[in-house]
Swiss-Prot record:
It is found in: Cytoplasm. This is Arginine repressor. Regulates arginine biosynthesis genes. Belongs to the ArgR family. GO terms for biological process: L-arginine biosynthetic process; protein complex oligomerization; regulation of arginine biosynthetic process. Pathway: Amino-acid biosynthesis; L-arginine biosynthesis [regulation]. Gene3D superfamilies: 3.30.1360.40, Winged helix-like DNA-binding domain superfamily/Winged helix DNA-binding domain. One of its GO terms (molecular function) is DNA-binding transcription factor activity. It comes from Phocaeicola vulgatus (strain ATCC 8482 / DSM 1447 / JCM 5826 / CCUG 4940 / NBRC 14291 / NCTC 11154). The gene is argR. The lineage of its organism: Bacteria, Pseudomonadati, Bacteroidota, Bacteroidia, Bacteroidales. InterPro entries: Arg_repress, Arg_repress_C, Arg_repress_C_sf, Arg_repress_DNA-bd, WH-like_DNA-bd_sf, WH_DNA-bd_sf. Keywords: Amino-acid biosynthesis, Arginine biosynthesis, Cytoplasm, DNA-binding, Repressor, Transcription, Transcription regulation. GO terms for cellular component: cytoplasm.
Amino acid sequence: MKSKNSRLDAIKIIISSKEVGSQEELLQELAKEGFRLTQATLSRDLKQLKVAKAASMNGNYVYVLPNNTMYKRMTEQHSASEMLMHNGFISIEFSANLAVIKTRPGYASSLAYDIDNRNFDEILGTIAGDDTIMLVIREGCTRAGVKNALSLIIPNIQ
């Protein structure tokens, strides 16, 4: 049985990556990911996540996460299970001794927490927002070295 937290994460991922207009559709998407739950449980989860409905660009009403009514949907389709395995990681870019990691909304602070708690020699510290992390990289460390260290937390970083 999958945990409530992973179910809530899956709901967030599905809502932010697909246009879902009904609880029935959402239950079907969750079933594809291996989650079995009742409509009543889903309703409570949606309330806890403060999910609302808003008009999409094509005029249909779809579920949206709070503060993300005009949320940019991903063009590449990934399953919620794939996204959960990757800590919401999207990309990393480097500039001098800084790196910027882009994540799915809501994932940056937990990923930064994991990075900070690993005490990587290559990374002095992080600053995280909702979907962006800035890494301060120790002088003399290579980009490959940073990516290699981060691969312990983010398997799909390479």
